């Protein structure tokens, strides 16, 4: 079992979604390495979760990656956007975490070339970050690995405060509509659907001590 598999499979999916905040996402490309700090996540709890693609164990070719082992990449397309998820549990348990926001680190210029918008709107959403990273569905079903896309667990930042809210866009799903399964770094500017007044412009919500 790899370090990433151990990290992902030793806790519940909501716990993993919180633990991923501040971890470094690392993408190896032909033109260099892009890295970013994860700022926003959502947990999806598989067969019991009415907001999940795997609700009631609904399995299709589109969501097959969800049934693979922890650390598998699950990418699906919603309208024009591709969205990045990481499978969190053992094979056969189709739970995952959606990466909703990242704070650019290495390779900011490249990200801005791939998504030419003001930096405030660069990676503060699940589709936006995929465009900035230049990712499509090619990695769907593959394992996180240093040669392509990985989590660098040795490099991380500690959030000062984590906020939990209902997930975005989950409507008419009973208790799952209001379940607090979305998590983000309070004060970070690279988070979707936040008030600009709440931004910590000095430290971006990360602990400095």
Curated annotation (Swiss-Prot):
GO terms for biological process: base-excision repair. Keywords: DNA damage, DNA repair, Hydrolase. Its EC number is 3.2.2.-. GO terms for molecular function: alkylbase DNA N-glycosylase activity; DNA binding. Gene3D superfamilies: Methylpurine-DNA glycosylase (MPG). It comes from the Bacteria. It holds the Pfam family Pur_DNA_glyco. CDD domains: AAG. It is an enzyme of class 3 (hydrolase). Transmembrane segments: none annotated. NCBIfam families: 3mg. PANTHER family: DNA-3-METHYLADENINE GLYCOSYLASE. Belongs to the DNA glycosylase MPG family. This is Putative 3-methyladenine DNA glycosylase.
């Amino acid at each position: 079992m790899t370090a990433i598999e151990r990290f992902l499979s030793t806790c519940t999916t909501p716990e993993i979604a919180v633990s991923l905040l501040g971890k470094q996402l690392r993408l190896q490309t032909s033109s260099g390495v892009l890295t970013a700090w994860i700022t926003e996540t959502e947990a999806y709890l598989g067969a019991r979760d009415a907001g999940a693609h795997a609700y009631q164990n609904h399995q299709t070719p589109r969501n097959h990656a969800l049934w693979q082992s922890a650390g598998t990449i699950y990418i699906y397309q919603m309208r024009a956007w591709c969205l990045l998820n990481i499978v969190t549990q053992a094979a056969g348990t189709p739970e995952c975490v959606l990466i909703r926001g990242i704070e650019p680190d290495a390779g900011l210029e490249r990200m801005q070339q791939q998504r030419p918008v003001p930096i405030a709107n660069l990676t503060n959403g699940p589709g936006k970050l995929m465009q900035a990273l230049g990712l499509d569905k090619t990695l769907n079903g593959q394992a996180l690995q240093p040669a392509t896309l990985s989590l660098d667990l040795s490099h991380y930042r500690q959030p000062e405060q984590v906020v939990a809210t209902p997930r975005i866009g989950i409507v008419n799903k009973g208790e799952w509509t209001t379940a607090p399964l979305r998590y983000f770094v309070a004060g970070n500017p690279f988070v979707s659907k936040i008030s600009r007044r709440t931004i910590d412009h000095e430290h971006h919500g990360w602990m400095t001590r």
